[in-house]
UniProtKB/Swiss-Prot annotation:
Ranges annotated as spanning the membrane: 565-585
Protein's organism: Candida tropicalis (strain ATCC MYA-3404 / T1) (Yeast)
Name the UniProt record assigns to this protein: Pheromone-processing carboxypeptidase KEX1
Lumenal side: 18-564
GO BP terms: apoptotic process; proteolysis
Keyword Signal belongs to the record: yes
Spans annotated as Disordered: 496-557, 644-707
Amino acid sequence: MLLSVFIILINTLFVLAIPPKEGSDNNPSKKYLVTDLPGLYENVKPKISVPLMFSGQLELYPENNTHYFFWKFVDSELNQDTSKKTIFWLNGGPGCSSMDGALLETGPFRIDENEKVIYNNGSWHKFGDIIYVDQPAGTGFSFTNEYITDLDQVAWYFLKFMEEYYKLFPNEINNEIYFAGESYAGQYIPYIADAILKRNKNLKENDVKYDLKGILIGNGWVSPNQQSLSYLPFFINHGLIDKSHPRWGSLLSKHEKCQKIVNKIDGHFDEADVHPYEVNSATCESILTDLLNYSQDRESDSDHRCINMYDYTLRDSYPSCGMNWPFELKYVAPFLRKEEVMHDLNLVDLKYWRECSGKVGRMFGARNSLPAVHLLPNISQEIPIILFNGANDIICNSDGVLSYLDKLQWGGKVGFTNKDDQINWIYDNKEVGYILMERNISFINIYNSSHMVPYDLPDVSRALMDLVSGKYEEKEKDGKREFITYPLGEVRNKLGQEIPADESSKPIEDKPDDKPIEDKPEETKPEQTKPEDETSSSTSEIIPTSEASFIPEPEESTSSKFTRLIQLGVIFIIFWGVYILYVSYRARPSSIIKKPARSTNSSGRKKNVQWADQLNRFEEDENELGSPPPQGIIAKTISKITGNTSNRGRYAPAGDGSREFTDDIELGEGISDPNVDEFIIGSDDDEDDDEDVETHEGNPKKTESKS
């Protein structure tokens, strides 16, 4: 018994002598660290290409059980240019997961046919830390008991997310901030940006100003009714339907009804009141539904009958009309539904992932919020706005974006004063698009790309961040202005040598030229750049300085080593003293040792056996990613001795472990592959687990979703 107590005491001293894992108490972000994914170390090479990752479901409001899921990627290569920049990426819907952005567009990974990650050479995390957020709550892996219904609430909730996020990553709070996203994020992002700018002007005590530098909206759904007027001209101009069609009269009639609604909106545009005819876009949006129906090629096979609404050069089955695209979506969905992956992503509440949530879309009526187009003029007075568009998209096409800009007043003028003043965008010696730019708003039309520009042209899309941050060259060729950007690796060398520091740090700005753009070039695809080879034989990961506080240093300082030696010396002396006492105790004459009656088994040994059995209850490990729960000194000792050997991320399924997945219904119709979710339009039925939820405004009408 006495010996057991001494052994426990010695082990306890060993535990106390070893410094606690750095960040276990002061760095709560450690429990969100992602250490593995299927295919990560098999397919992503060299090792330096593996990004530092954090993900999990971050609690915002415990009173209504609202948690936002985020997935953050940090460049593992030490890079001064990327270490002070943060990009928040949002997909649309409403109710479509930003995992589309992470795994199909701007993130470092794509998913292959084996449902494993492979590397994306065009990842935006090479420009700055990028965080993908599933929002509003109920989208993707986010969850809540109370769904939100309006755009103002989107902004409030996201500011709360940022507040909680910076508690996890306080070293990043002074970073430059960019927001980027696509489609219905054209509503989200302006509202969030506007809320941040207002917050910065009304800081409370101890608040830190958010350094918002710019927003980028790809194929954005910003002015719904106005943009819907572009559908019929688009189909005519691209030869997708002609005026001799038997249903032409019906199409023209609906177009005229939409035009009357838009005229009414224009007449009251400057009013602060929210008018029902402006926030209800059902009539105008139905034009596209009819066009897709009437333009079917009924002689084609069933899989190629309908025009793909996201890329008019592609075909799909009807009525999917693009909802089965991108084809890799059939790999993404089962990948995110794997228990192994949910384990790796640190989910604390298991949720069956779906690309788009019909429930979120139905609850999110946005009936009390003006369309985001109203916010652009004020935002542009403070930060640059980039509106980029894939030229092949129908649903949020370039003509629709230009049509609302033509009417918009910003910077004291209406629209672009000279639409012929187009700037050629050159990337990797190829003309990839053109730019219109005035008064802090830029429109960029990108050739040979769809609704999801980063999916088609990942390298080109990353160069958008070079445009918004001013990392480009400006030249003139044949009387036309050109903005020149470079592939990763070339940009710093070329710009560092040829552009003065003060020029390369400026965002794109207005410069005079009145020459028209030439005809669109032939289709070109930029070559993807390869990740740089490893320059060191060391197998240790390189961690960005912004995350250094989470990772133990490879070598301790001399003073730390000296302290360890003193501690170990003290422990050795104590151990030696205990040993001498024990030997003296055993060496005493047996005649003077009183032996109490007892069973054959030693009580002390029996306790040791019992403690060993209890070790199965402890999950603590010195390599555990999350902060350990409170423990007594004996429990710490036992945990230190035995420890858990799992090398995966924290995984704590809710409930008793028997909980079933939460299920949603697929959006839309006509999807032949059960693994493929609808990409955007329509939510016809409730999810299988449709439960009563609280909303802030009764039962809003069902709305189309734009991803």
